[in-house]
């Protein structure tokens, strides 16, 4: 019998790891991100001694991902989080909520890293698990995940996929909200206009912008109206219809003046002046 017992590798790992984990997840706690990353990296040989596919190693890798995410070092942390989740999924036992949350965290981190294809992959998985029994998400949260998928598809340059995705999402959102004039539809309709624009389908882009303008007018939401008129003006200018562009920008100035917001008035007037200057240069 050994004179001294130092415990199993799992016990030795837990003794060092658990206090670090508790510190990271303490909502009111403070710690040095770089020091925490170094302390966790130093534990990797001990976690690997427990097993190359052990729960301990998966937990360590995930916590490293969490810390890197807090430090906004998404490119560094993302591969660690992905590896951890693969190990956890291989072992089984994750609840739908855990799968939704972890895929969502990876998707959000991938967005921050501008790794949009990876973001699509994890956000789609998150949306899938969010629909399973036992996952407790509100309707707005579920639709929000799907809107982020559309954004990631667009940023990945997958414009046709983004358009189809967002068209279905718009139909589902209208049905869920029971209204065509819910302010939550504004961003989605705008995304569709952007998808169509990138596909060089100006007519469809104008169609969606007109829908968004009507929504803003119905809601009496000057922010939506002013932004949409600006986009319509840009499309008109790019299409060579300077008279229409000028008319749309003049409408923006009139609406801004009626609202009395000096910043909006200044911005709308500056846009109109810039258009006039460009017209003069091109004449």
Model-based region annotation:
Residues 49-53, 90-94, 132-137, 175-180, ...:
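Short coil/turn linkers that connect adjacent helices within long alpha-helical scaffolds
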Residues 36-43, 77, 81-84, 119, ...:
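Tetratricopeptide repeat
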Residues 1-103, 283:
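Flexible inter-repeat linkers and adjacent short helices
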Residues 7-14, 55, 97, 137-140, ...:
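Residue signature of alpha-solenoid helical repeat architecture, marking inter-repeat boundaries
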Residues 242-260:
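TPR/TPR-like (Sel1-like) alpha-helical repeat modules
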Residues 25-29, 59-70, 98-112, 140-155, ...:
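Conserved alpha-helical positions within TPR/SEL1-like repeat arrays
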Residues 34-37, 75, 117, 160, ...:
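Residue register within tetratricopeptide repeats
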């Amino acid at each position: 019998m050994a004179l001294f017992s130092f415990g199993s590798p799992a016990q030795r790992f837990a003794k060092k790891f658990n206090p670090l984990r508790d510190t990271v997840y303490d909502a009111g706690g403070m710690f040095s991100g770089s020091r925490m990353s170094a302390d966790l990296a130093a534990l990797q040989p001990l976690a690997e001694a427990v097993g190359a596919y052990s729960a301990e190693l998966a937990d360590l890798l995930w916590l490293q991902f969490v810390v890197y995410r807090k430090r906004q070092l998404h490119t560094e942390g993302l591969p660690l989080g992905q590896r951890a989740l693969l190990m956890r999924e291989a072992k089984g036992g994750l609840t739908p909520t855990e799968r939704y949350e972890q895929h969502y965290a990876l998707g959000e981190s991938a967005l921050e890293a501008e790794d949009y294809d990876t973001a699509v992959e994890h956000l789609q998985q998150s949306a899938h698990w969010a629909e399973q029994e036992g996952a407790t998400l509100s309707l707005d949260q579920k639709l929000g995940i799907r809107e982020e998928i559309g954004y990631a598809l667009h940023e990945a340059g997958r414009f046709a996929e983004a358009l189809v995705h967002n068209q279905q999402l718009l139909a589902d959102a209208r049905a869920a909200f029971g209204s065509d004039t819910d302010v939550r539809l504004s961003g989605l309709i705008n995304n569709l206009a952007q998808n169509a624009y990138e596909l060089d389908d100006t007519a469809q882009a104008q169609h969606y912008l007109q829908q968004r303008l009507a929504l803003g007018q119905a809601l009496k939401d000057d922010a939506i109206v002013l932004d949409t008129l600006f986009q319509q003006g840009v499309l008109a200018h790019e299409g060579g219809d300077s008279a229409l562009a000028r008319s749309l920008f003049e409408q923006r100035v009139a609406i801004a003046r009626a609202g009395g917001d000096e910043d909006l008035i200044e911005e709308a007037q500056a846009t109109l002046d810039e258009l006039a200057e460009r017209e003069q240069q091109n004449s």
